[in-house]
Amino acid sequence: MGQRMNEENQKQDQKDEIAGKQEEPGQIVSEKVEKKREEKPKKKRLRIQGAAWRRLDNTAKLFAAVSGEDLSSVFRISAVLKEKVDPELLQRALVRTLPEFENFRVKLRKGFFWYYFETNNRNPGVEEEQSAPCRFIDPHRGARFPFRVSYYGCRINFEVFHGLTDGLGALRFASRLTEHYLELVKKLPVMVQEREFSPLREDDYLRHYRKLPHRHYNSRPAIAIQGEFLPFDQMAVLQGTIEVSALKTECRKVGVSITKYLAAVLLWAIIQTETDGKTLKRPVALNLPVNLRNFFESETLANFFAVVNISWAAGKAPEALEEVIASVGRQMDEQIVKERLEETISYNVSNEKKWYVRAIPLFVKHLAMQMIFLHSTRAHTMTFSNIGRMDVREELRDQVESFQLLV
């Protein structure tokens, strides 16, 4: 009680001291001037990146320009649980997850020179899946988030616009969303995890950019998969499952990693089904994303990946799978090294840094990037992506049947 009164007296003494100072006219003027000087920077701070807006990273600018109803640039990570999903608990889990990923609380805006992300203060909602997966997320319809959370039966779906994040960022979000949902289902205490990645660092491409002699992307047209086109509003999804232990056994037999083995098998399958198996008129090529965080210091949850082209050249077709495995292994060992990836970063960022490119209005950039993108897509037959191990913490694993990726 006495201590409380002493504190109140000290506060009153401070007020009296301030009041005494205000009786000096000269000091009032100086204090007002100082206050004005201090207030100016505060107004500027509101426009600092990460507070109300931030630039798109180097890769996101391309996705924002080329995406639409016919090319959504949306990919999906799903968690298949052992029990039917409760929509109300999933909504609570989403509200609990979003504050852990501050760079996801945004909406896409269009500026005069570039697209940018603006803070979105609304709460996202969950929805029951009723249409095709990976639909375009139109940023101009309301204040939409650049991601979608849906459910169907025992499955939780997290679909995200590739301009917001890459496979690692989406994997982190989907895992935490699943964990928070299962915490609510099982009435477990919330497990707070230390942040492994910084949510507000916006572009590690620029941070690791060095002006280097760089290689241009391969633009020679590759073999295209033939088949019957589905109607615009339909999509075919094929899913296969294999035991990891059995897959590792096959990889050990030929002495390669899982990624090398599956990439080689995919190339071999395309050659067997799309050619006569003897001669290739065009190369068969895979577009393979590479996580740059494995080679450069990075804490970003924005995009930070590069793509490499793994192919079998035009001409004589391989006679056995072992030939393709050996070729794929050599190509990946040569291309997926820090020096080559630095050249890729240099090429991508150097175009953005040119003053005359920065000065071009967005609608002109938009058309140019669409043309460049369409030209570059002809250089690969298919995209093959391995985003790594998908998991939840140990005490929740018995509630999860599997994880799925759909690009």
Tell me what each language-model feature is.
Residues N157-E159, N309:
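Short hydrophobic beta-strand segments that form the core of ligand-binding sensory/regulatory domains
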Residues K82-E100, E159-S175, Q239-D276:
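Acyl activation and transfer enzymes in specialized metabolism, enriched
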Residues G26, S30-N58, L164-R172, R176-T249:
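Non-catalytic, low-complexity flexible loops and terminal extensions
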Residues R76, C154-R155:
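Short acidic-rich active-site patches of cyclic nucleotide enzymes
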Residues G2-E8, K21-Y115, N121-R148, Q239, ...:
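Acyl-thioester-dependent acyl-group transfer interface
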Residues F112, G153-C154:
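Residue-level signal for tight coil/turn positions that link beta-strands
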